[in-house]
Amino acid sequence: MIKAYLRTVNRMAAFEKFIAGRLYASGDRTKGGTRPAVIIAMTGVAMGLAVMILTLAITRGFRHQVSEKVTGFSQDIRVINYDVSMGEEELPVSCMQWMLDSLNASGNITHTQRFAAKAGLLRTDSTFQGFLLKGVGQEFDFSFMESCLLEGTVPECTDTVASGRILISKKMADILEVSVGDRVDACFMQEHIRARKFEVSGIYQTNFSEYDRLYAITDIYTLQKLNGWEPYQVTGVEVRAANNDEDPLYDAYLAARNVFNAAADQFGERYLIQTTQQLNAGLFAWLDVLNVNVGMILLLMMGIAGFTIISGLLIIIFERTSTIGILKAMGASDSSIRKTFLILASRIVLRGMLLGNVIGVALCLIQQKFRLVPLDPENYYLDSVPCELQLWWLVLLNIVTFVLSVLMLVGPSSAISRVKPSKSIRFE
């Protein structure tokens, strides 16, 4: 009896798929071309999905590139003297080699680098510009700065000898009217004005106005001598978190806190440990607002796609009233006919999704390759619209779109139950 029931179910499923296939094949084209209902439904799904792909790709690309620039310049965590945050300038912290070794051995940290900083003036014979000179050691990761280089090279920085070279931004170079190889004077205000001459080794541009108008980079040895510090005294330490679990930044923060708390007991200094998000709270709050906007756009596009596919299904049902009547007269149940039209609509949705994927992914790849849509870096930190495609969210978006589209069709398909065979066949 169970086998007989299963055979019946299989036959009904085969019947529904067969009828849906016939309707799809015969209803897809008429003498005048493709049916408007099918075109409307497919276009709505395609355009909705394409816009959703573009929205996610642009937003994720924007967040990723902006975050990379922030962390590329100052890493994930910064450790400085606590009193600096209270308004006391140029107070060093002690950074012994064992502290760096302990951080690097924690497993939650992949890189550490010391830095020293001092505010001053860069000047030429005709003009001057305020700046913050950042001194770095031989362990400094220049990969981000090298990716932002417009010309020249990064200076060779050590903690044992002055390089006499400086890396400045394009904004500074334009103001000072200097280029690679030119010499500039740097003046620093202390009890007496102290000056240093530097050769411009390279010019960078991050498109972050906060960085480009302020920071120049040289060796840490020069800064330690200017400040009168010992070799183990620095402005702070920058730490890069290991991306090895769900919350790598928090684990790296805890590791840094443990090391520097122990150092505070030994040296009597107070250390302030801050993450990139804390240092750039306004920027990351703005990025979070973008996520809210993305959610609203996705809901809107899903609603538009759902509206068009529902409209298309209802039009197809009304056009196929006589077919529904004939199927009912032959003994087909309302649920069976509803499944038939849902299968038909699902095929239309899949066809529209295929077209939407092609359009959305193609536009993203074109923008990645040719950067056709520019941005004002003064306002958006980037010079072109970023697009970041990842397979996992692309697959997830397609699955959610298909499931929600089919679920939205269940209600409108109930119109089939109102079709009376006698009236619909006579009407035809």
Regions found by a protein language model. Give the residues of each.
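Hydrophobic secondary-structure segments that place a key small or acidic residue at a functional site
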Residues: 116, 131-136, 153-222
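Short cytosolic juxtamembrane segments of multi-pass membrane proteins
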Residues: 414-428
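Hydrophobic alpha-helical transmembrane segments of multi-pass inner-membrane transport and secretion
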Residues: 33-62, 288-323, 346-355, 403-409
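Short helix-loop junctions at transmembrane helix boundaries
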Residues: 351-397, 410, 414, 418
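Transmembrane alpha-helical interface segments in multi-pass membrane proteins
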Residues: 314-316, 323-368
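N-terminal Sec/SRP start-transfer signal
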Residues: 2-49, 428
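Hydrophobic, regular-secondary-structure patches
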Residues: 50-132, 157-160
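Mechanotransmission and gating elements of multispan inner-membrane complexes involved in transport
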Residues: 189-294
